[in-house]
Amino acid sequence: MGGKFVRLGDVCIVGTGSGNRQDATEDGKYPFFVRSKKVLLNDNYEFDEEAILIPGEGGIGDIFHYYKGKYALHQRTYRIHPISDAINTKFLYYYMFANFKKFILMKAVSATVTSIRKPMIETFEVPIPPLEEQARIVSILDRFEALTTDLQTGLPAEIEARRQQYEYYRNKLLTFKHTA
């Protein structure tokens, strides 16, 4: 698949939040994205938008959140918010999820990357296929993601049901009556 590539900084706002981890509240109203896969809660929000959220430290290239709505953001977590109508945010999320870690590792001096900065993120190049193609790709990947999620939640329940069924039939098959 060919197409034009642009720097992320040319089509997106890249910035961080202002929150600290201790700003999290147990019963908060808004998601609070910090530098981990686990999303915390906060009573206040900083942004109301569609964005991709990645840690600036720890889990770099492994942790990606896509979010649409009101949210709070940690001071070392980056938000990537498209400002160009030429790019679908969910398409960008999938593209970054598949390619960003390799990009970061190529830029790094060592095999591990402990932190990234805004200029590094802004130089990441992304393709800009036609919006219809982006929507088609998102639709396909959304279906695969839903299927994967269903399997991850449904499979343990199915395994447990089969285990119980096995135990039932095993006990039935191995129960004998004494005859005189």
Where are these regions (language model features)?
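Charged, alpha-helix-forming regions
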Residues: 1-180
